[in-house]
């Protein structure tokens, strides 16, 4: 992603005039288990900030259905009290190579009942573990909706150049338990991809996510 696009996302995070103090989120960590046997863990540690913006260190690890590491990421995230955000991450994928990604989120609407956000991301893929494989880019975006912090839905799509692959996903979330310090969610969704040579069917997946806040 170009520097101008990254700066535009950063400005969107910082320039909003709406101030909703309850929107500030300080997530310490989360753990997810999926129906296909995969799992993941994520950690966010605030480094510095004020009453409007918080800069955090972030990290995550994903595991396959044999409980072996399938991806590890680390980076920085900037969160705004109005629900906007920007992140920069580096990812190592065993058997593939590395990824460098930037992502942005802009909150479009928020009140006591509804929360709607748009997101976009760009990833530079470097398949160093695959001989003679070229680097390529993945660009994508989507929308997230939440009703009363209880029921949510999301849609996203992404396109990878060189390999000419398109990915699509649709999902829903149901909050089962929430307290000031923790949250338990049930997730369900479908995903598919297509290339010039093959198109997958919609594949279902369900899982549970537990988050701890501080």
From Swiss-Prot:
Signal peptide extent: 1-19
Main localization category: secreted
One Pfam family per UniProt: Attacin_N
Keyword Nucleotide-binding: no
UniProt GO BP: defense response to bacterium; innate immune response
Coiled-coil positions: none
Expression across tissues: Highest expression in fat body and hemocytes and to a much lesser extent in Malpighian tubules, silk gland and midgut.
Up-regulation conditions: By bacterial infection.
Cross-referenced InterPro entries: Attacin_C, Attacin_N
GO terms for cellular component: extracellular region
Entry keywords, A to Z: Antibiotic, Antimicrobial, Cleavage on pair of basic residues, Immunity, Innate immunity, Secreted, Signal
Subcellular location: Secreted
Propeptide: 20-26
Domain of life of the source: Eukaryota
Protein family: Belongs to the attacin/sarcotoxin-2 family.
Known role: Hemolymph antibacterial protein. Has a wide spectrum of activity against both Gram-positive and Gram-negative bacteria.
Name of the protein described by the UniProt record: Attacin
Organism: Bombyx mori
Top-level taxonomy: Eukaryota, Metazoa, Ecdysozoa, Arthropoda, Hexapoda
């Amino acid at each position: 992603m170009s520097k101008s696009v990254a700066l535009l996302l950063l400005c969107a995070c910082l320039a909003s005039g709406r101030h909703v103090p309850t929107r500030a989120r300080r997530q310490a960590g989360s753990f997810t288990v999926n129906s296909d046997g995969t799992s993941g863990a994520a950690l966010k540690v605030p480094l510095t900030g004020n009453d409007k913006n918080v800069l955090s260190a972030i990290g995550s690890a994903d595991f396959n259905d044999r409980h072996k590491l399938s991806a590890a990421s680390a980076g920085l995230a900037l969160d705004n009290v109005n629900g906007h955000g920007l992140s920069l991450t580096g990812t190592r994928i065993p058997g593939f190579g590395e990824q460098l990604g930037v992502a942005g989120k802009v909150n479009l609407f928020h009140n006591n009942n509804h929360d709607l956000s748009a997101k976009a991301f760009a990833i530079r893929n470097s398949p160093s573990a695959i001989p003679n494989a070229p680097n390529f880019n993945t660009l994508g975006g989507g929308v997230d909706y939440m009703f009363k912090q209880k029921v949510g839905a999301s849609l996203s799509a992404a396109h990878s150049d060189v390999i000419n692959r398109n990915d699509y996903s649709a999902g829903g979330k149901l909050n089962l338990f929430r307290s000031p310090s923790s949250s338990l969610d049930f997730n369900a969704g479908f995903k598919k991809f297509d290339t010039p040579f093959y198109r997958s069917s919609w594949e279902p997946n369900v899982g549970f996510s537990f988050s701890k806040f501080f």
